[in-house]
């Protein structure tokens, strides 16, 4: 299972009521447990998690759990020894957390994703950044319908003003062995044969899960690590959208394929080719995903 707590970064030992500085969400990673969700939430809310600001290439937050979990059996050391995360991925306003006052993270609620098999697969970052001459980049433009923030204590104030939001993910490149470029129609045919299925989960925040149920290009299959299922967490793709979805309900309303030149220099020459799903080529497992409920992605 993958747990995703959301809570408040606040002063550790205030003389009066705790002063909340910002909202945060440190993904603790994967673990195994047979406990009920209510028991896992109780343990998360009682945890003593220390938060400290630090910096490297960018500003970071260090989370240290002084009360290691007993119900889930962690697969990694993060839930027991702590973790250091990009501040923009784990906090909505790190600039408000003071250095001269000890800070802690207090969990308010959490979501739990139970994959249908042993885990999930994310495409390596180097492969996502790989570009090739005379190749066509296959991207997806995902449109989410966002309901207003949940609960009386809203952390996100502008959720009502943003009924829909989009983010783009890179799937891979279509490339011939010879120095010839595939036509847009040929790429569209290959996409239709893939039989793509999409759903939302809760790994590292609200995550997009894809599964190919049909025939896949050998080159594209190799780029995806010879896997037919992939996970794309928005916390790695679009940090602003990820923070927006912390306290919002959302569902997929539209998925479009976008064909672009693989090499950035050619973007100024060739226009985008947008393929709308008018014939139901893409299948979406349509469930409204609230942030404070268990989420189940498609079969991995």
Swiss-Prot record:
It is found in: Virion; Host cell membrane. Keywords: Host cell membrane, Host membrane, Host-virus interaction, Lipid-binding, Membrane, Viral envelope protein, Viral matrix protein, Virion. One of its GO terms (molecular function) is structural constituent of virion. One of its GO terms (cellular component) is host cell plasma membrane. Its main location: virion. The M protein has a crucial role in virus assembly and interacts with the RNP complex as well as with the viral membrane. Associates with phosphatidylserine (PS) and phosphatidylinositol 4,5-bisphosphate (PIP2) at the plasma membrane. Interaction with PIP2 triggers matrix protein lattice polymerization. Matrix proteins induce host membrane deformation and curvature necessary for virion assembly/budding. This is Matrix protein. It comes from Measles virus (strain Yamagata-1). The lineage of its organism: Viruses, Riboviria, Orthornavirae, Negarnaviricota, Haploviricotina.
């Amino acid at each position: 299972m993958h747990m995703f707590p959301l809570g408040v970064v606040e002063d550790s030992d205030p003389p009066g009521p705790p002063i909340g500085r910002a909202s945060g969400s440190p993904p603790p990673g994967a673990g195994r447990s047979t406990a009920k969700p209510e028991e896992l939430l109780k343990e998360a809310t009682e945890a003593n998690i220390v938060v400290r600001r630090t910096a490297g290439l960018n500003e970071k937050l260090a989370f240290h759990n002084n009360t290691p979990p007993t119900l889930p059996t962690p697969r990694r050391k993060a839930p027991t020894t702590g973790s250091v995360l990009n501040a923009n991925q784990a906090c909505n306003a790190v600039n408000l957390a003071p250095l001269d006052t000890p800070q802690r993270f207090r969990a308010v609620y959490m979501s739990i994703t139970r994959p249908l098999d042993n885990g999930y697969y994310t495409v390596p970052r180097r492969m996502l950044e790989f570009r090739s001459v005379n190749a066509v980049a296959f991207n997806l433009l995902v449109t989410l319908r966002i309901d207003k923030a949940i609960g009386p204590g809203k952390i996100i104030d502008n959720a009502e003003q943003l009924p829909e939001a989009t983010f783009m993910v890179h799937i891979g490149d279509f490339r011939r062995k010879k120095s010839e470029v595939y036509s847009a129609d040929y790429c569209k045919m290959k996409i239709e044969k893939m039989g793509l299925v999409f759903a939302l989960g809760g790994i590292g925040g609200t995550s997009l899960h894809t599964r190919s149920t049909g025939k896949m290009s050998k080159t594209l299959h190799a780029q995806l690590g010879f896997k037919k299922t992939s996970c794309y967490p928005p916390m790695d793709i679009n940090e602003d959208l990820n923070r927006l979805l912390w306290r919002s309900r959302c569902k997929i309303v539209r998925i479009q394929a976008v064909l672009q030149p693989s090499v950035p220099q050619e973007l100024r020459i060739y226009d985008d080719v947008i393929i709308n799903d008018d014939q139901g080529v893409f299948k979406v497992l349509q469930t409204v995903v609230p942030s404070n409920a268990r989420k189940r992605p498609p079969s991995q």
